[in-house]
Amino acid sequence: MRVIRTNLNLSEDVIFNLSIRKGRDDVGNLTVYKHPEDEKGGQVHIEIAPKWRNRWVSRSLRDDLMDKLISVAKGFGLKVLYSTAFTDVSPRLLEFAGFSEYNVREPKTYYYLMIDGV
């Protein structure tokens, strides 16, 4: 898996976008939008392609993704806040990293993670 910073499909409310890829497959996107109530904050929205949704189980993958998200967010003067719940069962990446599901529909399910200003 690799995470690439892109500027594709950005609206004026978008701070930055990260593409998640496995080889040539597009696994999903992390998009950070401006926070409606915090000028220096943002909201992360994540989209995972259906075929990859049940594969987000490794801690190393979660750590790699969050490290890259935090690194890029810091470049924009943001601080990422997320919580983790350690368990004996291999949790899915999104739940493990504190993402919340907010819109379930085919072919995508949307999740969010709050980002606060520094």
Describe the residue ranges of each PLM region.
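Conserved acetyl-CoA-binding loop-helix of GNAT-fold acetyltransferases
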Residues: R55-S71, F96
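Conserved acetyl-CoA-binding loop of GNAT-fold acetyltransferases
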Residues: E95-R105
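C-terminal "cap" of GNAT-fold acetyltransferases
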Residues: P107-V118
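Conserved beta-strand-loop-alpha-helix junction that forms the acyl-donor binding cleft
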Residues: L81-P91
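Short, high-confidence coil segments that cap the C-terminus of an alpha-helix
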Residues: G75-L78
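A conserved beta-strand-loop-helix scaffold within acyl/acetyltransferase catalytic domains
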Residues: S11-F16, V27-G41, N103
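Conserved acetyl-CoA binding element of GNAT-fold acetyltransferases
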Residues: E37-R55
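Short amphipathic alpha-helix that is part of the acyltransferase structural core
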Residues: M1-I15
